[in-house]
Each structure stands twice: as structure tokens, then as C-alpha cells.
Amino acid sequence: MTSVKRAVVFSGGGAKGGYQIGAWKALREIGFEPDLVTGTSVGALNGALMALGKYEDARSIWENMSMNRVFSQFVEDTQAQNLPPETLFKRLAREVLRNGGADISPLQELVKSLMDEDALRHSPIRFGLVTTRFSPIKAVELFIEEIPEGEAADYVLASAACFPFMKSYQIGNVKFVDGGYSDNMPVQMAVNAGATEVAVVDI
């Protein structure tokens, strides 16, 4: 008799990542306990939090998410001028063009504060993500045991580097961009890892 291996797959989806928490809640309610979770972009962040068992943290993040928590001093400066949203976004677009992507330092700090790498490596839920190596473009699929020690948070951020809106994310000498450029819904990654039942959360 073939043993069942359950997986959850979180797609990329940017600001819609909060909807994945609703799906996570539903999976908890029906008792769907995954053996592994894979994710791309914002799905990599939510997937890591699932592997860590941080449902309440994930829910709190998305309930309180605002531009201030994603972008840097740029938002504080423009909001202090009491600008309408249309003007704010136009200025943000100009910053993206001028600087090669928006500065998302607050988001980076938030992700790094949440990533308990030791717990992630020893979680009963195996975690995997997709990112994209930049220039030349190449898909990169990694499970937690393949990620170098001390770089788990960096690879989650690399998976979510929504270039060109955000800057590419550099790890060592290599630049990465959003995993959605390679595989926005890493179902096959889960199947290749032995998943026989897959819950796909596509937003």
C-alpha cells in the first residue's frame, strides 16, 4: 500500500498573499496536515511560515500590512506631504525607474525577524521555494536542506524580489528575481518530492 504524502503549494501573488492565509485556515479546519510545502514569491514567505507553524504571525502580518511595512523612507516622506494616492504611486514609479527598483528594507527586516532558520530546518514540514537566477535567467528550486546555512531568509526574499518593481536580490555574487519568472505555482516540485495529495492555493 502506497503511503500518503501531503503537500501544500502556495503560488505567487504579490499583495494578494493575504488570501492564502484564509486557505491555510481552511486547511487547518479540515485537518489537512502537510508533509511538505512549496511556494513562490509571497507564497514562499507564507510557505516558510506554515513550515514554522506560525499561523497567527502570518495572519497578523497580512491583517496589518500597509505600504509603510513594505517600503522604506520613501512612503514616510510622501505621506508626510499628504499627497493623494495617485501622486504617491507616480512618485514610486519614478523611484523604481531611477533606482532600478523600490527599496523594501522594512519588508526585508520583517522577513528576517520571522525566519527561525534552525526551527525551519528541523520542522516536520519540509519547506521548498522557487526563485530565479538573474542574468542569465535560470530557474532555481531549493528545499531547505539545499539552502546554505544562514541564508534561508535571504532565499525567501530572493523568491519574492518582484523585479523590476523591486530591486533584484543579491546573495553572494548572484542576483535573483521573483520566482514567478520561473514557476509561479511549484506543483511539480512538490510531486517530484513525493507528494501524492496536493492542496494548491492559487491566487
Q: Regions from the language model: what does each represent?
A:
Residues 1-40, 48-203:
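Patatin-like phospholipase
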